[in-house]
A protein has these predicted regions:
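A sequence/structural signal for flexible, mid-protein segments enriched
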Residues: 22-359
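Bacterial N-terminal signal peptides that target proteins for export
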Residues: 2-11
């Protein structure tokens, strides 16, 4: 009996320690409120708009009672509505747009649950998302101001945001196609090729876009292996357009940078490979809202604790911005075999290049 009493006393002692260690002060009637967390990035060359809406907690009391609610981060289906509206924009200085009171179009977004990942890394449950399919009408409405609304069952607006699309350069008709001229150099019309005739310098020059604030060029390097064309994307550093009157922007993707990407990607290759005499140049662009959000995210990932996350969501948090990711040009690659130029330098990497050019 002494042993039993000793054991019981031991368990009571441990239990009391756990109670003290896990003690949480909270009031079941504490004031707390749902704050919508909204993420949407428009791309005028995409036919579908996707919006992620979750909810987060803001209040002065404990999160304990909030965390016990099942699926507390998602709004149940039917509890909110998400709308996208396009308002006619009035042009201002530097291609800025201000919304007028003329509604061009509107869309009620559809609720959809994306399947979750049941196990392994990044396991999660199903993810609710909202979408609409304006089609290529977005392409025609780059002079509009877009408004995003999150509305509850009582028809109250929980969150609201506006943004404008990154615009287009002058569109021209060539045959039956609409052509936009963004890339300036290399100029394929003048027979220019992308390469490193000036050692270590591969310049990309482009026309700035209306409401384009942040740009990132990417070089798509191609090579041939067993008759198939493979690609290695080589990202350049991004450029922020701080001068609204600037009409041209440029950035270099150096030979050194290209070689380092290729060497890392092909370090385990044991086959003979060939250079393809064509490269792709992709230019991504985003507007001021998305640039400010990305910039604040970069600050948050650093060592400093003195930062604020940018949000343009009224009544909530998150981002409603725009980007363009389909600006692509294919240009010839400089096929000079001289010492110090691309072909000879690729061969020196010892990752399988024959030194010959594929087609």
């Amino acid at each position: 009996m002494k042993l039993r009493r000793l054991s019981l006393g031991f368990y009571l002692c441990v239990f009391s320690l756990l109670v003290v260690a896990c003690h949480v002060e909270f009031s079941p009637n504490a004031q707390w409120r749902d704050i919508p967390s909204v993420y949407c990035v428009l791309d005028p060359e995409e036919d579908t708009v996707w919006v992620r809406v979750q909810r987060c907690y803001l209040g002065d009391d404990t999160l304990y009672n909030y965390s016990t609610i099942a699926d507390s981060t998602n709004y149940p289906e039917g509890s909110i509505r998400v709308k996208l509206l396009a308002w006619e924009g009035q042009r201002g200085t530097h291609n800025s747009l201000t919304a007028t009171n003329r509604l061009v179009d509107s869309w009620d977004l559809v609720y959809l649950e994306l399947p979750g990942k049941p196990d392994g890394d990044f396991a999660s449950g199903s993810q609710p998302i909202y979408y609409c399919v304006p089609g290529h009408r977005l392409l025609e409405d780059t002079a509009c101001v877009f408004e995003l609304l999150v509305i509850n069952q009582r028809n109250d607006t929980l969150a609201r945001a506006t943004t404008s699309l990154v615009g287009f350069q002058t569109l021209t008709r060539v045959g039956g196609d609409t052509v936009e001229s963004v890339l300036v150099e290399p100029n394929t019309a003048r027979g220019h090729a992308f390469g490193y005739r000036v050692p270590n310098k591969g310049e990309i020059k482009w026309n700035t876009l209306p409401r384009g604030r942040r740009y990132q060029p990417t070089l798509i390097f191609h090579y041939a292996k067993h008759g198939d064309t493979m690609s290695i994307p080589v990202k350049g550093s991004y450029l922020v357009n701080t001068n609204n009157d600037l009409t041209l922007s440029s950035k270099s993707i150096t030979q050194e940078r290209l070689l380092s990407y290729v060497k890392e990607s092909l370090k385990d290759n044991r086959d003979t490979i060939y250079i393809v005499n064509m490269v792709g140049i992709v230019i991504d662009a985003c507007n001021e809202d998305l640039h400010a959000y990305l910039n604040s995210q970069n600050s948050a990932s650093g060592a400093s604790q003195d930062y604020q996350i940018y949000s343009n969501i009224e009544g909530g948090v998150g981002i409603f911005g725009s980007r363009r990711t389909h600006i692509l040009a294919n240009v010839p690659c400089d096929s000079s075999g001289k010492e110090g130029y691309l072909a000879s330098e690729l061969k020196k990497l010892h990752v399988g290049f024959s030194g010959d050019w594929g087609k």
